[in-house]
Amino acid sequence: MTGRVALVTGAARGIGAATVAALAADGWRVVAMDLCADDPALPYALGSRAELDRVVAAAPDPAAVAAAEADVRDPDALAAAVRLAEERWGGLDAAVAAAGVIAGGVPAWQVPPGQEQAVLDVDLGGVLNLARVAVPALLRRPEPRRGRFVAVASAAATRGLPMLAAYCAAKAGVAGFVRALAAELGGTGVTANAVSPGSTQTPILDESARLYGLPAAGVFAAQQPLGRLVSPAEVAAVIAFLAGDGASAMTGAVVPVDGGLAL
């Protein structure tokens, strides 16, 4: 994979940070993007610039990873991150939509509108916005193209999780979107896929535990036949596979990385 270029959103921590690490270890050059600020609509801390800088510093070659602060709800900011990849490294070969937030803890009709909108705008709108600016860049690569668009969905896309209605709706939308995008990209050499993580050791799972009044996120492990939580690195390994040549025959897939949660 040496010489290929990726853009990863939500890169300061969790699955996004692990994806940057996995791609960098495989020789990719990566634009690691995150908002690096809290959202006043959400009751928990989001990724910080310090965390993003640590992701960059941990890469085998920190010069091959560029940090970018941008909001996935802002198409112009996303376009600037794509331009950074093209201007610094000559193009874009993969776009990974890993930014996500969560809110809830009460029935759908009681969720504050600002929280609900934040989840929909980041978790679904952010994926659409990334595709809007990244897919044209993937298509600008010369033929035969090997472009990859990969989004992070969730096992919540197919499960009716109480008190997390907006999150379930957004992730179901991600799964549907990548299938439609894959159909639209047919014949171009660019593919679109998603991963569907189960309960994964991330700040979002910590917040989920708080929303459910649980003592720790580890309680969710009991739901998965694997008997433990999934690690961000395990999800990132599948994302890196989908971004690579080994997944060239896969498009429109939503790949479970869920410890058997969907069984």
Where are these regions (language model features)?
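Active-site helix of classical SDR
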Residues: 131, 170, 178
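Short, small/polar-rich loop/turn modules that mediate ligand/substrate recognition or access, typified
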Residues: 146, 186, 191, 250-252
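Short-chain dehydrogenase/reductase
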Residues: 2-89, 103-106, 114-115, 207
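C-terminal substrate-recognition "lid" of short-chain dehydrogenase/reductases
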Residues: 89, 228-257, 262
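Residue(s) in the substrate-gating loop at a strand-loop-helix junction
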Residues: 154
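Substrate-binding pocket helix/loop in short-chain dehydrogenase/reductase
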Residues: 106-108, 115-120, 220
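Alpha-helical segment proximal to the catalytic Tyr-Lys
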Residues: 136, 183-187, 248
